[in-house]
C-alpha cells in the first residue's frame, strides 16, 4: 500500500500539509462537476483514498489534474508552487499563473523532492522550502542522472556536459519527445 513509485510521481520527503490537503480534496469531491464525464464522474471517486500515504494521495490528486487536460509540468506547478507571493523578479505571467491556480489548489508543501513522468516529460521539482537535496548531471552522450547526491553512478568526467542542483521551488524538466531540457524561467 505504501510502495513507490506511483502512476506519475515518486517522492523523497514528507508532505507536511498532508492532513489539510487530504481534507480539502474530500470536500472538493462533493463539488466536482464535469460536462464530459457527467454522471460517470462518480466512478472516479474518491479522488484520494483513505489510509494511503501522503505520496499516494498526492499522486492521485495529480492524476485528477492530468485528467482535466493539464500538462504534467502545469499540474506539478499547481501542486508544488514556488514561493511566488513576494517574488519581485518573477515574470508577471508566471506570477499570474500561480495566483490563479492558488484559488484551485493549495500547495502540497514538503520538505520534498518529487520526481515525475508521464512518458512525454520526465523531471523533478523541489518544494519551496528546499530542504531535500536534488542534484543532476547531464552527459555529452545524452544521459540525465538525478539523485539526492552526486556520484551515484560512475561517469567519465570528460563526458559531463553539466552538473546542477535543483533550487527551492524550481523544476528540472526534460521533454522526451523533443529530446531537450526545458528551462524553468
Task: List each language-model region with its residue ranges.
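Conserved short alpha-helical segments that host acidic/polar catalytic motifs at enzyme active sites
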Residues: 1-185
Amino acid at each position: 500500500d505504501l510502495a513507490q513509485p506511483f502512476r506519475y510521481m515518486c517522492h523523497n520527503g514528507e508532505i507536511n500539509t498532508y492532513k489539510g490537503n487530504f481534507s480539502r480534496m474530500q470536500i472538493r469531491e462533493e463539488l466536482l462537476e464535469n460536462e464530459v464525464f457527467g454522471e460517470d464522474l462518480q466512478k472516479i471517486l474518491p479522488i484520494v483514498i483513505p489510509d494511503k500515504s501522503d505520496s499516494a494521495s498526492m499522486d492521485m490528486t495529480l492524476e485528477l489534474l492530468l485528467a482535466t487536460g493539464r500538462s504534467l509540468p502545469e499540474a506539478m506547478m499547481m501542486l508544488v508552487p514556488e514561493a511566488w507571493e513576494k517574488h519581485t523578479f518573477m515574470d508577471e505571467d508566471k506570477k499570474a499563473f500561480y495566483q490563479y491556480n492558488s484559488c484551485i489548489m493549495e500547495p502540497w508543501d514538503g520538505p520534498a523532492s518529487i520526481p515525475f513522468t508521464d512518458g512525454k516529460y520526465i523531471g523533478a521539482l523541489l518544494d519551496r522550502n528546499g530542504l531535500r537535496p536534488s542534484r543532476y548531471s547531464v552527459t555529452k552522450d545524452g544521459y540525465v542522472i538525478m539523485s539526492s547526491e552526486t556520484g551515484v553512478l560512475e561517469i567519465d568526467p570528460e563526458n559531463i556536459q553539466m552538473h546542477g542542483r535543483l533550487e527551492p521551488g524550481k523544476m528540472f524538466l526534460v521533454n522526451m519527445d523533443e529530446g531537450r531540457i526545458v528551462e524553468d524561467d
